[in-house]
UniProtKB/Swiss-Prot annotation:
Amidoligase domain, as annotated region: 1-270
Pathway involvement of the protein, from the record: Pyrimidine metabolism; CTP biosynthesis via de novo pathway; CTP from UDP: step 2/2
Subunit: Homotetramer.
Organism: Burkholderia ambifaria (strain MC40-6)
Miscellaneous remark of the record: CTPSs have evolved a hybrid strategy for distinguishing between UTP and CTP. The overlapping regions of the product feedback inhibitory and substrate sites recognize a common feature in both compounds, the triphosphate moiety. To differentiate isosteric substrate and product pyrimidine rings, an additional pocket far from the expected kinase/ligase catalytic site, specifically recognizes the cytosine and ribose portions of the product inhibitor.
Protein name: CTP synthase
E.C. number(s) listed in UniProt: 6.3.4.2
GO cellular component, one term: cytosol
Active site per the UniProt annotation: 383 (nucleophile), 520, 522
Annotated Mg(2+) binding sites: 71, 144
Protein purpose: Catalyzes the ATP-dependent amination of UTP to CTP with either L-glutamine or ammonia as the source of nitrogen. Regulates intracellular CTP levels through interactions with the four ribonucleotide triphosphates.
Residues engaged in binding L-glutamine: 356, 384-387, 407, 473
Keywords annotated in UniProt: ATP-binding, Glutamine amidotransferase, Ligase, Magnesium, Metal-binding, Nucleotide-binding, Pyrimidine biosynthesis
Class of enzymatic activity (EC top level): ligase
Amino acid sequence: MTKYVFVTGGVVSSLGKGIAAASLAAILESRGLKVTLLKLDPYINVDPGTMSPFQHGEVFVTEDGAETDLDLGHYERFISTKMRKANNFTTGQIYESVIRKERRGDYLGKTVQVIPHITNEIQAFIERGAASATCGEPDVAIVEIGGTVGDIESLPFLEAARQMSLRLGRNSACFVHLTLVPYVATAGELKTKPTQHSVQKLREIGILPHVLLCRADRRIPDDESKKISMFSNVPEDAVISVWDADSIYKIPQMLHDQGLDRIICEELKLSPKDADLSMWSELVEKLENPKHEVTIGMVGKYVDLTESYKSLIEALRHASLHTSTRVNIEYIDSEEIETNGVDSLKHLDAVLVPGGFGRRGTEGKIAAIRYARESKVPYLGICLGMQLAVIEFARDVVGLKQANSTEFDPETPERVVALITEWYDRDGKVETRTEESDLGGTMRLGSQRCPIKPGTMAEEIYGKDVNERHRHRYEVNNRFVPQLEAGGLIISARTPSEDLPEMMELPRSMHPWFVGVQFHPEFTSTPRDGHPLFKSFVEAALANKQARGVKA
């Protein structure tokens, strides 16, 4: 039977519940347990697909095409279990399901209320998510409850967790509470009062935490841990210090050294083998001892909030691990390029344009792409970054001066990039879209097979056909492909059913390393294995730096 660990947060948001949950999962997996994770989001949106990256950060896409919270990306990077739609759900989905049941008459005329109907539905979603784990029936399901204790939005989720713990019985569920212990510089000490109040708030709901994870900018002294233990009624050895680290991949070892996994296993009456965290130690060793160094410019419009590109940043870090190269990322606002030109790019070893939506900043990105192409600087374009690379090539090489995307200019006569109106989803079902379709849940989503053209750089990089994850509604227009290919551009991968361009590149006679992909390879990169495309990109950046005579 699956045991459950509920992870809650207190005092403030953004303390790192997702990293803490993923790190615990990694330790338990290293002990031979089958583990899955779920994220419960208390916002009313059905999913984060239409939410602003400035508010929500990155939208992580699962293999089966769900637009989910970025924490699911952390889950997949820390453990081997793949996430699915059922691993993330929101208040919006819960209420949508309950209202649909009420309309069908499932409640037989009863008054539908938060308790028991909403809380029962939350429990059903949790158990369904755990049961659908790709690892088979999990030994442990770690359930991260979004938001902060005390938020009105989180109350139904916390109540559902309390009820579920009671229903499952002793040693079947436990609670881990992540809280802030701030350092007050003027007083010169850590303050435990916010944590005391946070635990008190949790106890008012009827939840008694078994473990406290205390976030601080430094290790919490024993005296403060004793005080927290006394006031929160949590054993002293279960008051665990989680201080700031320069790499999230150090957190599993940090938590294991303080006995978190031992406490959880004892509480859940599990007796797995000892933990083997040698892989994490090796990763940290590689991170801290690189042999080379490169600087890559990421040109986008969400650069003030790097959470918008979380998986991409991590994929570059994974590539650094597997190439022994420290990757420094410079975030460059594409609108500043529109105003000030491309001088800010001239010291870079490579340029990357990530995915995105909307017209704002696109001409700055196109200017950056033109600079990379003409200056022979390695270039990687992802999703929108590929589309803009095709537009730049069409304008400046092929001579289609009005080339554009219908996303930015619906009336452009040279629709080099246009809306996909029909495609097959990963289950073989035909999907159709028009300009009038809803924004939410209407993109080409999830993992799709990409056959690669023999003799291309793409084949050198991947070595075989691949399955990559997608999130887009616009695509390179096949009507212009003959003109683009006549100019030298190579379409190096296409979808097997609809013949949609999936990868483009320039031949080495035109450029040493210039690649665009319609999919999002960052979603499948892990610290264990890296990703061949990002490894090749970092190697190209290193070669460019060395070719310029700069010490790498």
